[in-house]
Structure formats: C-alpha cells, structure tokens
Amino acid sequence: GRLPHPVARQAVLDQLPPETLTGLHLRAALLLHEEGAAPLPIAHHLLAAGQAPDWSGPVLVEAADSLLTGGQVDRGLAVLRLAHDGATGTRERAALKVALMQAEWRIDPATAGHRLGRLAAAAHAGELGVEAQVTTAHCLLYLGHTAEAVQVIDGLTALDTTPEQAADIRFLTVWARYTYPGLFTDEPAEPRAARRRGAECMVNSRDALAHALETVLAKGPNSAAVVTAEQFLPRFSLGPGTPAAITAALAILVYSDHVETATLWTDRLLTQAAERGAPSWQAMLYGIRGDIALRAGHLADARRYAEAALAHMSAPSWATAIGVPLSTLIMACLGLGDLETATRHLDQPVPDEMFQTVWGLSYLHARGHYYLATGRAEAALDDFTTCGDLMARWSVDLPTIVGWRVWAAEAYLALKQPDRARTLAESQLTQLGAEPSRTKAAALRVLAATVPPAQRPALLRDATEMFRGCGDRLGLAYALADLSRAQRALGDFQRARLTVRRAYDVAGSCRADALRKVLLPDVDNDALENADASGTEAFHTLSDAERRVAALAAQGSTNRQIATKLYVTVSTVEQHLTKVYRKLNVTRRADLLVKFGPLIGDIA
C-alpha cells in the first residue's frame, strides 16, 4: 500500500539506512527513465542519490536547462554539477564544463570565468564541439582575454562545419570586430561552410544579423539592417547563447535612432531576465536601457538604469563592458547638474583593456563632456580627438557610435577657436549625408555658433526639427536655448522669450537642472499670459496639420521651408495658413506669435 500523508512517507524514508535510500532513488530514477518520464522527476531522484549513472547525462542536461529557464538557477547548477561529476568521456566532461560556465555566468561572469583557462586549452586540444568553442570565445572576449579568444576563433574558421555552425562562427567574428574593433587588423577568414555556400546566402537569423551588424559598422545605419534587427528579436528569447546576438540587434536599433523600438524590446527582455534569475543579463540590459534613455534625453531614467546595471553586477564581472553603465551615469549626472557624483564615478578604476573596445570610446566621450562641464576644454579636446584617432585606426569612424567631431568642435568653441569648430562641424555634416539624425542635429547646432547671427536661426530650427524627430528631448532643449539667444541677438525679443520658455520647459521634462539654471534668468513668465481662454479654445479647433503649419510659420519659416519640412506642396501650406488665420481671427504671422505663442511653443 501507499502511505497517504507526505509527512508519514518522509518519516519512513528517514528511518532507512543511507545506502538503502540511495539505492531506492537510483531504482526510481531508472524506472522513470525507462517509462519515458520527464527529465525533472528523474533528476530529482538522482540529486537525492548523489549519483549520475552512465545513462543519465542527457537527461540531467535537459532537466538543468528546464530549471534554469524557469529561474531555478541554484537547482539547475546542482544538476549540472552532478552530470559533470558523473561524466566519463573527456569531450562530455568538457561540454559540461561549458554548460556549467554558462549557468554560472548568468549570476557572476567573473566567478564563471575561472573555467575559461581550461576551456581554452580544451578547445586547442580539439576536445570541444563547435558550439562550445563559440561560447568559450564569446566569454574570453567579454573578460578581455583577447589573445586566447583570437586563438579559438582562428581554430574555428579552419574547421569543416555545417551551414548553421558557420553562421554562428560568422556572427562571433563580426561581434569580435564590433566589440574590439582593433582586434583584427586583417579580415578574419570565413568559415569553410560559408565559403562553400557564398556570401549572399543567409542560412539563419544569426547569419543575417551578422551581415546587418557588419553593414552598419562599414557604412552606418540603414533601413535593411533595422528590418533585420526587428525580425530577429521576436524569434529569440533570452538564453545562454543569445545575449551577444540580442545586444547586437539592440545596438543596430539604437545606432539607427529607433529608440522607441529599442525601448520596447529592452523592457520585454528585462522581464525575461528577471524571470530566469539571471542578474548578469539584467545588468547588461539595464546598461543598454540607460543608454537608450540618455539618447532620448531622459536623464533621471538614464541615471536610474545605469545605477541598476552597476548594482546587479560587480565591477570585475562587468569587465571591459563597464564603460557602458559608467559612461551613461557620468553623462546623466552632468545633465542633472550633479558634478559630485559624476566625479566619483570617473574616479572608479577601469580595466586598461576597456580602451581597446567600443565601450572605451563611450567612456572617453563621457569623460570629455565632464572636462567641458568643469572648464577643462583642452582635456576635453584631447579625449574627443583620441576617440577620433582610435576610430580611424580601427576603421569604424561612425558618428552613430561616437560623434567625436561634433564634441571636438564644442571644445574648440570653448577655446575661442570658431574656425576650427566650423571645419569639424562641416566635416561631420558631409560625412552624415542627407538623412536626419541626432548627430546631424548636434552638428547643425555647433555650426550655428560659428556663422553670422543672421544665419543662425535657420540652422537651429533645422536642428530642433531633427532632435524632435529623433526623440532626443535634451538635444531639443539645448537647440531651443541656442535659438532663443540667436533670436534675441537679432532683436526678435518676443520670439526669444517664448523660445527660451519652451527650452526651459523641455529641459524640465528631461530633469536637465544644469541647463535650467542657465536659462532661468531669461525666462519671462509673463509671456505665458498672452493666450486667453477664448484664444485657447479657438486654437484647439485647428487640425493637427494646421497646428503644425501655424507653429512653423510663427517660428519664422517660409512657406517653401514649411512645405519641405512637412513633405507637402507650397499650395497646401498656403491653404492651411488661410484656414489658420480665419479660425484664429488673425491677419499675419506676427499675430500668431503674440497671441498664441505658448500654445505654439507646446507644438514646437
């Protein structure tokens, strides 16, 4: 018979000699296995027995995977250790060492990294399969062991592989060139399977992602790469083999100014990482989320996410990638006016190897801004031009990674050298081409500071449009602040008062206290009282298109300029303005600004 109560059953089991109980657990595990039971109950009995019979290896690995996916990391690690200890073959034990490292990695990469020396040796000895070697190389790169990583990658490219394995190797090599741009002085060899099938054949999503990332690194962001990233993300959940690929897909979106899509996916992935009990994955994603928030001008959020990234993982476990949260945190604190905290984080030691990585470029960029904010323009210029020198040497001179020319131009302006600033700003604009972007908007803003006063408003209006279109609220606030100064210099005091108020409000939405303190003396609250209740009601009868035309007209744009910005004909603009004048009972553009300035500012 069966004892009905679990306490009674446990009491009986507790009376059995240990060797008898072990034997019972082993017999139960074998019976379950022979009956085709699920791996988890079998693993439960084997863990209780503390033994892994010859037949149990695959079952234990599958059970561990299920436990890890469900967030039971400690239990999953215990099952993997049992499988490893019971393995008899050299290749099997090596593969289980990789699985153990991956499981430990989700908690603490620095601790998991103690296995890498033996795994690199196993890879060199031919004891690891292709997938295990790819994983080992990724981990070696992350912790800054570049010589060993290159050795593993070189060995992989010499192997005969399946198309799927070749795709993973190809992504690894592209990822290595992205994270360590100076690592490969020559183009690494293609895997043999890739050479056989031809470069144009994309055998799986990771191969397509590698191609997209490679294209972005060579030519900058493009719509095809964005589509690839957007198609990749829904197909892969967060797991041991996906963090690098997911990071690559998010990087493509971020570099392409698709911050809303990147935000959506990062938030979803953060939920997955929490469910899987993976603090290192959470840390990585918080770091990315902080960068996204910073690019959108959400300074308080950027700081919060960067602090969460550092809280979820120690500095040794961040290794060379610590440049991601640190650079975000420094930039956010500068914008928030918290120089003390920015200084404290700059004083934190960082690994020398970080400056060989793309994350080191972000750190230099942030440190340069710190020097600018503290009046050390020469030091800032040195950091920005060092970025430029490294990017040129590494053949990744892409403003989407770091727009060093714009910020070097800012340093030259601080040094009272406007001619050099203009040369760099114009060079940046030439490199960027016609497509709008955050960096192009920043370059236009710097260029405006180097031209005669009468030419500044047009450049700054273009900059505000681009910042707005890219979702960069902080950039928009700075451009509006510059526009208000340009308007005041030309004697256009009414527009200047309204523009500076708008800059102040946008800066407030970003929590940009440093900028708000600068703007506060020029803010005229009386300018907000010009729109009475009836005027407000009339303004809200306008269609969205009419409001947009009214805002641009009030800012001083010509009908042709409005048509170009809104992608409509001049005739359409004229028709909209006629309706605007009639609905608002005004006869000229100046009346729009005087009577409805604050309302128009809300659109701008």
Where in the sequence are the language-model features?
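Residue-level marker of regulatory loop/turn positions in helix-turn-helix DNA-binding domains and
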Residues: 21, 52, 401, 541-542
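Alpha-solenoid repeat junctions
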Residues: 36, 50-53, 104, 108, ...
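Helix-turn-helix DNA-binding segment
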Residues: 482, 529-604
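Short secondary-structure boundary elements
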Residues: 1-78, 82-85, 583
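Internal alpha-solenoid helical repeat scaffolds
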Residues: 39, 71-324, 332, 440
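Short, charged/polar, Gly/Pro-enriched secondary-structure boundary elements
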Residues: 9-12, 51-57, 148, 177-180, ...
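Short helix-coil-helix linker/hinge
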Residues: 36-40, 473, 541-545
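Helix-coil-helix junctions within alpha-helical repeat/solenoid scaffolds
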Residues: 5, 74, 79, 84, ...
